[in-house]
Regions:
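Conserved nucleotide-state-sensing and coupling region of NTP-binding domains
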Residues: 89-169
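Residue-level preference for the first positions of well-ordered beta-strands
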Residues: 55-57, 85-87, 167
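Contiguous, well-ordered alpha-helical segments that form the cores/surfaces of helical PPI scaffolds
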Residues: 43-47, 68-79
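Walker A/P-loop
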Residues: 52-72
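Post-Walker A helix-loop "phosphate-sensing" segment adjacent to the P-loop in P-loop NTPases
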Residues: 77-85, 108-112
C-alpha cells in the first residue's frame, strides 16, 4: 500500500536545518526542561558537524544528557539524509548497544516521528516488533531491506525517502 501522508510538513521542514527545534518538536517529553548554555553550544556544534561536516568531542557532566542528545542527533542526521552512515561510539560496547536500543525504541515507538517521517518510520512500525519480518517486507513490490539487529539499524529502502538505506551502527 501507500505510505501515510506527512502530518505536519511545516514542522518537518523547519526541523531539517534546526537540530534544537527537532529535539523540542519530536522529543518533547525527553527535552522538557529549559536548555542550558552548555547544551545550546553542544547543539550548535552538532548541527554544524552534521550539516557542514567535521568532528568534535563532547564532554559534559554525568547525567547532563550527552547520550540522549547524541541519540537524537543520529536520528536527525539520517532521517533528513544529512548523513547516510552514523557510527555510535560509547564508553564501552554495552553503552553503545544501549544507545542503539534507545534509537530503535524511538524509531519504533515515537508517534511524532511516525507522523512526519512515514517514509522512514512507517515500514518499521509495520514490523510490529518482529525483526524476522524485515526479510520479507515489500513496498510497491520491492524489498525494503530493513536491517534491525542488535548491532545496527538499516532504514528502509524507499525511493522517495531521504533516509533510504541509511545505517546507524
Amino acid at each position: 500500500g501507500d505510505l501515510p501522508i506527512v502530518v505536519n510538513p511545516p514542522r518537518k521542514a523547519k526541523a531539517s536545518s534546526d537540530f534544537r527545534f527537532f529535539c523540542d518538536s519530536y522529543f518533547p517529553l525527553t527535552f522538557s526542561l529549559p536548555w542550558s548554555d552548555d547544551h545550546l553550544k553542544v547543539i550548535a556544534r552538532i548541527e554544524q558537524a552534521v550539516l557542514r561536516g567535521g568532528l568534535f568531542a563532547m564532554a559534559m557532566p554525568r547525567g547532563s544528557g550527552k547520550s540522549t542528545i547524541s541519540e537524537c542527533a543520529c536520528i536527525w542526521s539520517v532521517l533528513y539524509g544529512h548523513r547516510e552512515f552514523v557510527c555510535l561510539i560509547g564508553s564501552d560496547e554495552g553503552h553503545a548497544m544501549d544507545m542503539l536500543d534507545a534509537i530503535k525504541m524511538e524509531l519504533d515507538g515515537n508517534d511524532l516521528l511516525l507522523d512526519d517521517f512515514p517514509e522512514a518510520v512507517y515500514p518499521i512500525h509495520c514490523l510490529d516488533g518482529i525483526a524476522n519480518r524485515c526479510n520479507g517486507q515489500l513496498y510497491k513490490g520491492e524489498r525494503t531491506h530493513i536491517g534491525w539487529t542488535a548491532r545496527e539499524v538499516v532504514l528502509p529502502t524507499i525511493a522517495e525517502s531521504k533516509a533510504s538505506a541509511a545505517i546507524i551502527k
